[in-house]
């Protein structure tokens, strides 16, 4: 991985010239520590010192507790709409410990992105980028593995935040209407390499390579001990999990760029339709399914998209209590679940099929069926609104040209993907009507079907009907994954509830609909009733 240096950028922190410098480094450090400590609330000061000590000692239990519980609590209480203490203040408390300061700044800039009204300033975005570069250079460029222990949830959120800040910066960079000429010059010329797509891909691929995660996943699927191919770096959980999470975020990056084939391709070592030993972070598993399902939908593999969305939505229903204690994670997962219900509704309209009854029940309770009926009737505006709500926030890999007109280019990638999607929808918007007529008959003359669609039909309309029926056949025949580690593999299958062939001027129709299987539904209800009955019996009145 290429190294980057942030020396030319200042941190724009507060500087003070009233220190009583003695010339003795130890005394000066002690003075600065006491000076800055006096400016902080006591619980913040002790939290930072204990946090640093836990990182030094590699105490995973304490690190995870402070990261997941204490840090958010202090943020809510002291820094709800303001930033955490500056680097200089914290450095004086922890003796400028290099590793801890990089980790602290990662949390510091993440907090600014999430909490500060108006978002981060340009210099904060740049400084955050170079802090990530410092972290990745530290762990990737080292000749030997860095002995650093961090909980998996932090590693996932660190890598995912890295990609989020790239996405956020790309949108910020594309919005020229609220920037001065000097800011545009800095963004598009002076700092054109900051948060560049090449850097993001370089980092993620470097983490994948150094961890040998692909070889490890292939070994696991082949029943081989992954430690035989892991190498010195990959045998450590720290590097192994960073490599796995980088694969997932490569999926996200390629989806944001609209390269759906590559998005699925990069996950090939991961059997995405099977539960993995690495999928114990709910947010990671949900994010994976969201982007995989969306990529399948855009590739017109609706059956695979429906299966992906249905499986993960069932998982969310079962495991909601695992993340409900973390409000920010709960909000994020609920939003992504809502987006997936919208995408699932689109896929079911374009490719009707049976899904789990509990998912159907949610679609009914949240009134998705009304919108689905409108989409089936060809209402393109509903398709458009569902897509805009549920799709990722696409970005352009390149900044606007330095001499580009002063316009807002943020929506350009979104509008392009929307156009691609709507072109496909327009090709299919008449198919539900055709399907509804075919379902009523076992044999039907072409001329009669043409008259149903248009009472004033003539011979030309019958010829056009043949084109429509051919389109129906084509659109209902999808590539469907069946087995293997590659999500791109599959066999062509007809996903329609009916099939037909034409002999002379007669349509012969066969209903291939699979009847609902209610056994699983009743078993779940019985188990739920028994569980409720046990709880009632245990209540002491």
From Swiss-Prot:
Localization annotation: Cytoplasm
Annotated S-S bridges: none
GO molecular function: translation initiation factor activity
Highest taxon listed in the record's lineage: Eukaryota
GO cellular component: eukaryotic 43S preinitiation complex; eukaryotic 48S preinitiation complex; eukaryotic translation initiation factor 3 complex
One of the protein's GO biological processes: formation of cytoplasmic translation initiation complex
InterPro entries documented for this protein: eIF3l, PCI_dom, TPR-like_helical_dom_sf
The keyword DNA repair belongs to this UniProt entry's keyword annotation: no
PCI domain mapped to chain residues: 308-516
Keyword list, A-Z: Cytoplasm, Initiation factor, Protein biosynthesis
Family under the similarity heading: Belongs to the eIF-3 subunit L family.
Entry-linked HAMAP family: eIF3l (MF_03011)
Chain's role: Component of the eukaryotic translation initiation factor 3 (eIF-3) complex, which is involved in protein synthesis of a specialized repertoire of mRNAs and, together with other initiation factors, stimulates binding of mRNA and methionyl-tRNAi to the 40S ribosome. The eIF-3 complex specifically targets and initiates translation of a subset of mRNAs involved in cell proliferation.
Assembly description: Component of the eukaryotic translation initiation factor 3 (eIF-3) complex. The eIF-3 complex interacts with pix.
Protein name per UniProt: Eukaryotic translation initiation factor 3 subunit L
Organism of this sequence: Drosophila persimilis (Fruit fly)
């Amino acid at each position: 991985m290429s190294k980057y240096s942030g020396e030319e950028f200042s941190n724009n922190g507060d500087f003070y010239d009233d220190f009583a410098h003695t010339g003795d480094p130890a005394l000066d450090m002690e003075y600065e520590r006491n000076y800055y400590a006096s400016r902080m609330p006591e619980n913040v000061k002790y939290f930072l010192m204990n946090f640093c000590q836990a990182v030094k000692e590699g105490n995973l239990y304490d690190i995870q507790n402070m990261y997941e519980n204490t840090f958010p609590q202090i943020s809510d209480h002291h820094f709800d709409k303001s930033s955490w203490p500056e680097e200089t203040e914290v450095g004086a408390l922890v003796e400028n410990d290099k590793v801890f300061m990089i980790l602290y700044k990662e949390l510091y800039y993440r907090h600014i992105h999430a909490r500060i009204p108006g978002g981060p300033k340009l210099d904060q975005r740049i400084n955050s980028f170079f802090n990530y570069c410092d972290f990745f250079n530290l762990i990737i460029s080292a000749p030997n593995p860095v002995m650093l222990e961090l909980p998996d949830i932090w590693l996932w959120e660190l890598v995912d935040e890295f990609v989020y800040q790239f996405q956020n910066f790309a949108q910020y960079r594309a919005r020229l209407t609220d920037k001065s000429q000097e800011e545009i010059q800095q963004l598009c010329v002076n700092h054109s390499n900051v948060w560049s797509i090449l850097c993001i891909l370089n980092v993620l691929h470097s983490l994948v390579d150094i961890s040998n995660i692909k070889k490890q996943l292939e070994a696991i699927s082949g029943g081989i001990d992954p430690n035989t191919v892991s190498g010195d770096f990959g045998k450590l959980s720290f590097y192994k999990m960073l490599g796995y999470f980088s694969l997932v975020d490569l999926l996200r990056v390629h989806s944001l760029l609209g390269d759906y084939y590559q998005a699925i391709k990069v996950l090939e070592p991961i059997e995405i339709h099977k539960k993995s030993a690495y999928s114990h972070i709910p947010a990671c598993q949900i994010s994976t399914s969201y982007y995989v399902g969306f990529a399948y939908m855009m590739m017109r593999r609706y059956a695979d998209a429906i299966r992906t969305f249905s499986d993960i939505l069932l998982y969310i229903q079962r495991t909601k209590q695992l993340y409900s204690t973390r409000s920010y994670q709960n909000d994020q997962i609920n939003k992504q679940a809502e987006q997936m219900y919208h995408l699932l509704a689109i896929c079911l309209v374009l490719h009707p099929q049976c899904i789990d009854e509990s998912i159907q029940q949610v679609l009914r309770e949240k009134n998705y069926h009304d919108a689905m009926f409108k989409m089936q009737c060809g209402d393109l505006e509903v398709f458009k609104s569902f897509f805009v709500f549920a799709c990722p926030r696409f970005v352009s890999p390149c900044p606007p040209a330095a001499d580009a007109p002063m316009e807002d280019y943020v929506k350009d990638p979104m509008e392009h993907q929307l156009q691609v999607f709507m072109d496909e929808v327009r090709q299919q918007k008449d198919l539900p009507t055709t399907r509804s007529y075919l379902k009523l008959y076992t044999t039907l003359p072409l001329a009669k079907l043409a008259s149903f669609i248009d009472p004033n039909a003539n011979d030309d309309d019958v010829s056009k009907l043949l084109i429509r029926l051919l389109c129906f056949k084509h659109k209902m025949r999808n590539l469907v994954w069946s087995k293997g580690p590659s999500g791109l593999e599959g066999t062509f299958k007809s996903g329609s509830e009916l099939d037909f062939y034409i002999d002379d001027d007669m349509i012969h129709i066969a209903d291939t609909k699979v009847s609902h299987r209610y056994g699983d539904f009743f078993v779940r209800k019985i188990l739920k009733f028994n569980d409720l009955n046990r709880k009632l019996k245990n209540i002491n009145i």
